[in-house]
């Protein structure tokens, strides 16, 4: 993932996530309240193709204790994940719960703006797996 600018580059420092630290990118900072970061799970088949589902997340304060201030993320992107591309049998219980909770949030946030037919479509594409 990476930071997001309002009117600027797609990859906005200083926040970012990678499988390894890349010092010259200057995007391995401590996350702060209010930062927007992308979450980009995907699959890449070397030499062939790749696909990502990219959502934007807001960093918010969570619990504080003797170890410090903990942060968590709230989803900003409200769009269904294509369930035709999901293999539930390859997912852990925690991953299924995350997807089902996200889809419930998408329904909650979007359904007030949809008519009856659109709401039926939304219910179908955000059904629990």
Feature map (PLM): residue ranges:
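Charged, cofactor-coupling segments
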Residues: 3-129
């Amino acid at each position: 993932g990476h930071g997001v600018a309002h009117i600027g580059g797609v990859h906005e420092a200083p926040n970012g996530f990678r499988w390894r630290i890349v010092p010259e990118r200057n995007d391995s900072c401590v996350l702060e309240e209010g930062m927007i970061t992308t979450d980009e799970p995907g699959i890449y088949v070397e030499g062939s193709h790749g696909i990502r589902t990219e959502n934007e997340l807001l960093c918010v304060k969570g619990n504080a204790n003797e170890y410090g201030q903990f942060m968590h993320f709230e989803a900003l992107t409200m769009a269904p994940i294509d369930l035709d591309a999901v293999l539930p049998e390859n997912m852990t219980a925690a991953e299924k719960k995350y997807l089902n909770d996200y889809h419930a949030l998408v329904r909650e946030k979007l359904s007030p703006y949809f008519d009856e037919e659109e709401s039926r479509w939304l219910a179908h594409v955000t059904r629990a797996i």
